[in-house]
Each structure stands twice: as C-alpha cells, then as structure tokens.
Amino acid sequence: MYVGYVLDKDSPVYPGPARPASLGLGPQAYGPPAPPPAPPQYPDFPSYSHVEPAPAPPTAWGAPFPAPKDDWAAAYGPGPAAPAASPASLAFGPPPDFSPVPAPPGPGPGLLAQPLGGPGTPSSPGAQRRTPYEWMRRSVAAGGGGVSGKTRTKDKYRVVYTDHQRLELEKEFHYSRYITIRRKSELAANLGLTERQVKIWFQNRRAKERKVNKKKQQQQQPPQPPTAHDITATPARPSLGGLCPSNTSLLATSSPMPVKEEFLP
C-alpha cells in the first residue's frame, strides 16, 4: 500500500502515469479471465470432477518372447501328445497314475515260525561267496582234531635250510662269528635267502655254540668234595647212668615183683 501511495503522487522524477498497468491488483493485470469450469463428469461425486479419465487399454498385448524356431522342432521332434481325458475320469475317481497298490499278503504261521536267516531267506551274492564266520571256522579246524591247539602264523614257522645253504653258512661262521653287513648281503644273494634269515641263523648259531661250550666246561670239571663248613658234628647222647649214677645199682638188681590180683565178690 505504501508503494502505491508513493507512485500515485505527482513527482517530476516519474513522468507520465506512475502506476504501470502490470502492477494493478485487478483482474485485468492477469490477462483475460479463465473460462468457466466444465460440468462434472460424475454428478453424484462432485469432488472427483477434476480427475482425468483413465486412458483406454491397448487393443492387444505384444508377445513377450519370439516364436519358437523351426530348427528346434526338427532336431528334437514333436513332443508327446497329452492323452485326452474323458469326462467320466475327470468327474469322479482317482487318476490312472495313482492307482491303489495292492497290499502284500500277511505272513502265515509257517513264516512266523521260521527264524531269521533260514533257508527260505534270500541271501546276497557276497554272503553266498563267503560265510560271515569263515575265519573263525578256520581257526577252530586248525586247533582241533589231534593238533596241539597253538595257532602259528606264516612268519613264525622255522625256515628249513638245504644242505648246501647250511654248508656255506657254516664255512662263513668258521671264519667269523659276527658277519658284516656287506658279506651278509652277498651271502644272502648267493644262497637265495634274505638278509634277515642270514642274520637269524648266525644268532642261533652263536647261541648254540655258547650252550655247547658251557656243557663241555661242566663235564671237564671234577666234582668238588664237601668243605669243612658243610660237615657238622653231631653231639653224642649221654648214657642213662651218667644222668643218675646212684640209681644204676637199683636198675641192675631190681626184679619184677609178683602182683596179686584180687577180685571182690
């Protein structure tokens, strides 16, 4: 309002009309008046008259994927045709794929009395080839029937040497009681033995030699007489007269006296 008052004064600084037409507050300052609003499209709902109507949907939707190629059908062939279902099967009853499974027959009295693993039970191919307790049966068979009952593995059996092998081993033992590693490997290769067998033979041969030498020494030594400490003198028993010298005459001259036996009536 103050601005309008200043502009309305006749001042030489602002010649001509002071108020421009654009500063007016009337409706002429904003151009021609707006046309009147159109009547509402929905008379029952006047508040929604300003809402524009929705655009019409397209006439047809476009295909999201391209049509299948002809080479796929040529490569894999046409798919299996679906069987046409009859109206009766669709109306009532289960589908043909879900037919009820017949229940197995119940076990009779003979099957209940038969134990597990009997002759009627089918066995697997592995069980037919090998029984479950085969290793136990072998040990029982080896332990019974006149055998001592001691089970010995294959590695613990005594090695039987030939005459040629024993002769060569004895020659080597005559030169050296303890064989060297190099000579042991050479001797094992020449005789067809292992180094362990040669080593064990030399160990047993040395033990046998010690036993023989000990026995010879015991035979050569004469039996030693008993020493003075082993002989103990037994004291002589004193005579009866030495114990009681005054009673010796009585014992010599004493005679038995007759004893009369009287029996009362």
From Swiss-Prot:
One of the GO BP terms on file: regulation of somitogenesis
Cite the Gene3D superfamilies for this sequence. Homeodomain-like (1.10.10.60)
Is Transcription regulation among this UniProt entry's keywords? yes
Where do Polar residues bias regions lie? Answer: 245-256
Which residues lie in Basic residues bias regions? Answer: 206-217
> GO MF annotations for this entry?
DNA-binding transcription factor activity; DNA-binding transcription factor activity, RNA polymerase II-specific; methyl-CpG binding; RNA polymerase II transcription regulatory region sequence-specific DNA binding; transcription cis-regulatory region binding
The UniProt keyword set, sorted, is: Activator, Developmental protein, DNA-binding, Homeobox, Nucleus, Transcription, Transcription regulation
| Region of interest (Interaction with 5-mCpG DNA), residue spans | 196-207
Q: Where is the stretch described as Interaction with DNA? A: 157-178
Q: Where is the composition biased (Pro residues)?
A: 30-43, 93-108
Q: Name one Pfam family in it.
A: Homeodomain
Its chief place of residence is nucleus
Which terms in the GO cellular component ontology are assigned?
nucleus
Which sequence positions fall in the DNA-binding region? 154-213
Signal peptide positions on this chain: none
Compartment(s): Nucleus
Q: Which InterPro entries match?
A: Caudal_activation_dom (IPR006820), Caudal_homeobox (IPR047152), HD (IPR001356), HD_metazoa (IPR020479), Homeobox_CS (IPR017970), Homeodomain-like_sf (IPR009057), HTH_motif (IPR000047)
- Low complexity bias locations: 73-92, 110-126
- Give me the ranges of the annotated region Disordered: 9-152, 206-265
Q: Into which family does the record put it?
A: Belongs to the Caudal homeobox family.
Its annotated function is as follows:
Plays a role in transcriptional regulation. Involved in activated KRAS-mediated transcriptional activation of PRKD1 in colorectal cancer (CRC) cells. Binds to the PRKD1 promoter in colorectal cancer (CRC) cells. Could play a role in the terminal differentiation of the intestine. Binds preferentially to methylated DNA.
What PANTHER family does the record tag this protein with? HOMEOBOX PROTEIN CDX, HOMEOBOX PROTEIN CDX-1
Q: What is this protein called?
A: Homeobox protein CDX-1
Name of the gene this protein is made from: CDX1
